[in-house]
């Protein structure tokens, strides 16, 4: 006879034991199982260690949180409540380390950083400043 039946409990398991995802065990929001599957199917290596997808998920989650925080600040500076690609671009390009990481990346609808050569700006001379007073 089977150890499990209608209304029966599985052998060796208690009623309170549930499956806990690897993301939950690691305290992450990013899907460790999906990243593990991508690493295996991507044929990056013959074998993938058990800690590799957890570590990669943690790194990706940290980078996403960092970019979102800076983009949120950029949106707030522009008095907007919604993050758009322009805010993401401003966040990345104004952060030295993220700019280095994403140096060759183009963000669609991001535009460019505002930059005017100081030589092209009108210079303030003593005559104009005295005339204002």
Swiss-Prot record:
Alphabetical list of SMART domains matching this protein: H2A (SM00414)
GO molecular function: DNA binding; protein heterodimerization activity; structural constituent of chromatin
Modified residues (N6-acetyllysine): 6, 9, 11, 13, 18
Record InterPro entries: Histone-fold, Histone_H2A, Histone_H2A/H2B/H3, Histone_H2A_C, Histone_H2A_CS
Gene3D superfamilies according to UniProt: Histone, subunit A
Source organism superkingdom: Eukaryota
Modified how: Monoubiquitination of Lys-124 gives a specific tag for epigenetic transcriptional repression. Acetylation occurs almost exclusively in the MAC.
One Pfam family, short name: Histone
Keyword match Aminoacyl-tRNA synthetase: no
Listed transmembrane segments: none
Task performed by this protein: Core component of nucleosome. Nucleosomes wrap and compact DNA into chromatin, limiting DNA accessibility to the cellular machineries which require DNA as a template. Histones thereby play a central role in transcription regulation, DNA repair, DNA replication and chromosomal stability. DNA accessibility is regulated via a complex set of post-translational modifications of histones, also called histone code, and nucleosome remodeling.
Name of the protein in its database record: Histone H2A.1
Species: Tetrahymena pyriformis
Gene designation per UniProt: HTA2
């Amino acid at each position: 006879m089977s150890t499990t039946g209608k209304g029966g409990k599985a052998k060796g398991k208690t009623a309170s034991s549930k499956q806990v995802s690897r993301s939950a065990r690691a305290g992450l929001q990013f899907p460790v199982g999906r990243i593990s599957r991508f690493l295996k199917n991507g044929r990056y290596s013959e074998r993938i260690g058990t800690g590799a997808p957890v570590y990669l998920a943690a790194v990706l989650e940290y980078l996403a949180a960092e970019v979102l925080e800076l983009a949120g600040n950029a949106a707030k500076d522009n008095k907007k409540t919604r993050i758009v690609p322009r805010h993401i671009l401003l966040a990345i390009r104004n952060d030295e380390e993220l700019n280095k990481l994403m140096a060759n990346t183009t963000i669609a609808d991001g535009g460019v950083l505002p930059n005017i050569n100081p030589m092209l700006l009108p210079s303030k001379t003593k005559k104009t400043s005295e005339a204002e007073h």
